[in-house]
Amino acid sequence: MRVEFTKYQGLGNDFILIDNRHQAQPCLTPDQAVQMCDRNFGIGGDGVIFALPPEGDTDYTMRIYNSDGSEPEMCGNGIRCLARFLAHLEGKPLQTDITYRIHTLAGTITPSLQADGLVKVDMGPPFLVPQEIPTTLGEGTDPVVNQPLEVAGQSWPVTCVSMGNPHCITFVDDLEAIDFQTLGPQFEHHPVFPQRINTEFIQVIRPDYLKMLVWERGAGPTLACGTGACAVLVAGVLTGKSQSQATIELPGGPLQIRWAGEGQSVFMTGPAEKVFTGIYETG
């Protein structure tokens, strides 16, 4: 089968975008997505994103397969790329103001293309109740903030946030001192996270400027994670380490994140750029 695709990237977090508006289910299997994401034998990417017909009062539906074939609830960098892709499919100019309502497995997400080329996304309010994340850390409905978690023989203070997908955030003194490749998988598969977890290691440079390394569930180390950056700001506010608006510096570049407090939406602003188009022959 021949599949037309367009590759996009948001701060180096790269995705294969497919026009799937003709049917409600993805036109590829998870195994085929794994093959496409292979950086040696395929196109290469952190995931495959499908633009599907709308559900309810939305404009489109988003589905995504990670590079390991798993399906996350949504993806922050990915939805910025999807918004750019949809504008391209609709023949909209690059410098345009347009807002989409996108149905995802995490609910309705609203990205807005801006005239300056950036994409601002209303990510909705964060989920802080342990059962909603989900995690077995903590009790009842109290947020998991600075709770100790034993990983690799060390106790880590962690804060848990869901942006529709689960995140575990830990603040450290020096990111360069972190054994990232060893710790990432151990956090991801820790038994207190029944659906596994995305993990962010954070160094606070200033209350309005935080540096972040991310280990993504199902993808491993990536250059950027939009939902992760949103979760980091929420964790920073909850722990008193950051302001309500801050720059989150990822290996691929900065995202601007804003959160006014409990019950309020988190807003993310950042780039999404087209890389190339092509045709892929599936096996």
UniProtKB/Swiss-Prot annotation:
Site (Could be important to modulate the pK values of the two catalytic cysteine residues): 167, 216
GO cellular component, one term: cytosol
Places the protein is found: Cytoplasm
Keyword Isomerase assigned: yes
Active site: 75, 225
Function (record text): Catalyzes the stereoinversion of LL-2,6-diaminopimelate (L,L-DAP) to meso-diaminopimelate (meso-DAP), a precursor of L-lysine and an essential component of the bacterial peptidoglycan.
Annotated organism of origin: Acaryochloris marina (strain MBIC 11017)
Stored SUPFAM superfamilies: Diaminopimelate epimerase-like
UniProt key word Cytoplasm: yes
Record keywords: Amino-acid biosynthesis, Cytoplasm, Isomerase, Lysine biosynthesis
EC number(s) per entry: 5.1.1.7
Main subcellular localisation: cytoplasm
Family: Belongs to the diaminopimelate epimerase family.
Short name of any one Pfam family annotated for the protein: DAP_epimerase
Binding site for substrate: 13, 66, 76-77, 165, 198, 216-217, 226-227
Subunit architecture: Homodimer.
Pathway: Amino-acid biosynthesis; L-lysine biosynthesis via DAP pathway; DL-2,6-diaminopimelate from LL-2,6-diaminopimelate: step 1/1
Name of the encoding gene: dapF
Coiled-coil region: none
The protein, known as: Diaminopimelate epimerase
Record field: catalytic activity: (2S,6S)-2,6-diaminopimelate = meso-2,6-diaminopimelate
GO terms of biological process kind: lysine biosynthetic process via diaminopimelate
UniProt GO molecular function: diaminopimelate epimerase activity
PROSITE patterns with a match to the protein in the record: DAP_EPIMERASE
